Amino acid sequence: MAAGKRRVASLVLLMIIWWSIVSAAESQCEERNDYSRKRPSHKPFTSHQNKQDRSCSSPLPSESCSTSAITPSDSAVRDTSLSRRGLPGMPGDIEWMGFYGSLLAVPTMLSILGIITNYNLGKSYYNSELNAQYYKQSREMLRAHTAKLIQDQEKKFANAGVSWNGMVYGKDGQVNPGAKLPEWNGRVLGGTVANPKSQPVPGSGGAVQGAAAGVGGGTTAGVAAGAGAASAGTGPAQVGGATAGGAGAEAQTGTGAIATGTGTGGAGDAGGSAPVSSGAEQGDAEAGDEARGSEERGDDGTEDRRGGQSEGDDDSDSDGNDEGDAGDAGDAGDA
């Protein structure tokens, strides 16, 4: 589009220049023709006219001078001037060469100037875009390095136990809860906020293991997996330990999940690890039989509680009460 406009402008300018030159040439030609018609023609000098002039120069007034001198015709004068210097006011070869040269020089000059200007503008625009992109990338790089440096330094301070108000990153390099990350034009710089959903849910299911060491080298170990719903956590489990030598240690481990933590054990509403009572002081077979009976009762209670969890009981307090009952049953067995 721009090239077409330049061509039209060049054509219009060319027509204006050509018309002005032609008009000036025509006007000059007319003026010169008028001047050549008005001026007297040069008469060639002849001996006859010389004699006539000498006869007219007589001092006697009675003598009259003859005015019948022979003059060349206008056509002869015109032919003579044409053969010598051409028609007055009519351009010759040199004039036409200059005219055509001027016609060719003007658009050529304009074209060259247009090409140079277009090249310079394009180069300037390209360099401007290049510089802008360079500085933009430099700013982005500096911001990224700054955010990474802040994260590393605050992580080191947090691991060293140093903290301050407005501290963004913690010991693990994650963003502290409630901290505000630096922004630039509405875009957050640096790390991302830790997703709380990625953390393990308190009370989620898993294997629960309890172990106790008996007197005389006897060991008791049991593993029970909670069979309750995932939302309610691991179900309480009781594992009875075998006795060693008739006077070993009995271990009761009640494991269960409460609403506030993932700890094992089921001693009342408080959770945690269940108390392990040792039967080393009693050491008689009757206490061992009573303990075994209490363990059987505890196993029955565990089955009942597991059945309650399978029915979708999510109440943490009721789970804690059941665990408390399991702990009481274990104490009764030890007694």
UniProtKB/Swiss-Prot annotation:
Residue segments, region Disordered: 33-84, 226-335
UniProt entry keywords in alphabetical sequence: Membrane, Signal, Transmembrane, Transmembrane helix, Virulence
The record's subcellular location field reads: Membrane
Low complexity: which segments have biased composition? 55-68, 226-241, 249-261, 272-282
Enumerate the Gene Ontology biological process terms. Answer: biological process involved in interaction with host
Assigned GO CC terms? membrane
Q: Where is the composition biased (Acidic residues)?
A: 311-335
User: What coarse category fits the chief subcellular location reported for this protein?
Assistant: membrane
Keyword Ribonucleoprotein listed? The answer is no
Q: Which N-terminal stretch is annotated as signal sequence?
A: 1-24
The answer, when asked if Transmembrane helix is one of the entry's keywords, is yes
* Bias (Basic and acidic residues): 289-308
**Phenotype seen when the gene is deleted:** Decreases virulence in Zea mays.
Q: How does it sit in the membrane?
A: Single-pass membrane protein
User: Which stretches does UniProt call biased (Polar residues)?
Assistant: 69-80
- Where do Gly residues bias regions lie? 262-271
Q: Where are the transmembrane segments?
A: 96-116
Superkingdom in the source lineage: Eukaryota
Task: Describe the subunit structure.
Answer: Homodimer.
Biological role? During infection, may play a role in establishing and maintaining biotrophy; the formation of a tight interaction zone between the host and the pathogen.
The name under which this protein is listed is Virulence-associated membrane protein 2
